[in-house]
Structure formats: C-alpha cells, structure tokens
Amino acid sequence: MSMEEEIAALVIDNGSGMCKAGFAGDDAPRAVFPSIVGRPRHQGIMVGMGQKDSYVGDEAQSKRGILTLRYPIEHGIVTNWDDMEKIWHHTFYNELRVAPEEHPVLLTEAPLNPKSNREKMTQIMFETFNAPAFYVSIQA
C-alpha cells in the first residue's frame, strides 16, 4: 500500500438504493452495495449457522427470504440512524477494510437534508468512528 493511499480521504455516497464508497483520487468507487439492513424474522431459525443480529448490503439481499429488510435512507434523507450506523460500519470495515480514524471522511447528503441530520452525521463520524476530519457535500 502506497503512502498516498494510506492517507487518502474516504468518499461515501449514501444513496436511497445503493451506497457507493471508495478513496478520493480513484476513478471509480471500490464498493457499491444496496443501502439495506436485514434482521432475522424469527429468532432461532438459523441456529448453528453463526447467525448475526443484522446483515448489511449484498449479504442482506442474498438472505432476504429469512430477513426483514429496512432501508435507512428515504428520498436521500436518513430516517433510521442505528441502521445508517451499521451501513457505515460495514462500509469502513467490510467493504473498504480501513480504520476510519486514520482517514478524513467525505459524505454526501441530499439537497434538502435538514440541518439536524447533518449534525447527527457529524456526531456519528466523530464520536463513533473517530474520523480525524469530516466534510459533508451536497449530491449533485
């Protein structure tokens, strides 16, 4: 891994349907996956299969028959912060395989995103993920 890549900013475009994530300076996103969180419909149905309490993205999509799916972003606006946090966690640790505290983070937001939502995004990035720097850009 080159020195530039180690400190490259992370860019995350949170869409209502798909989440796109990668590194600033790259030609294309490294990860594109559905913006969904799934939870088992029935407890115990997957006993012995290493059942998790939630699944994100493609894994949730592939197990949708036994999961209740939720879309935490509606019309570009985050409506479920716990699930959104799960999507960001999945983005950093599973898709990009980075430590968010080592990279500046750029997130996109919908043009009509309420100020309170921007504040909540900022709070989660700094307090939960310990991002060293954070910027919110309006989706164009």
From Swiss-Prot:
The keyword Metal-binding does not apply. Disulfide bonds: none annotated. Actins are highly conserved proteins that are involved in various types of cell motility and are ubiquitously expressed in all eukaryotic cells. It holds the Pfam family Actin. The keyword ATP-binding applies. SMART domains: ACTIN. GO terms for molecular function: ATP binding; hydrolase activity. Its EC number is 3.6.4.-. Keywords: ATP-binding, Cytoplasm, Cytoskeleton, Hydrolase, Nucleotide-binding. It catalyses: ATP + H2O = ADP + phosphate + H(+). Signal peptide: none annotated. It is found in: Cytoplasm, Cytoskeleton. One of its GO terms (cellular component) is cytoplasm. This is Actin-1. It is an enzyme of class 3 (hydrolase). It comes from the Eukaryota. SUPFAM superfamilies: Actin-like ATPase domain. Belongs to the actin family.
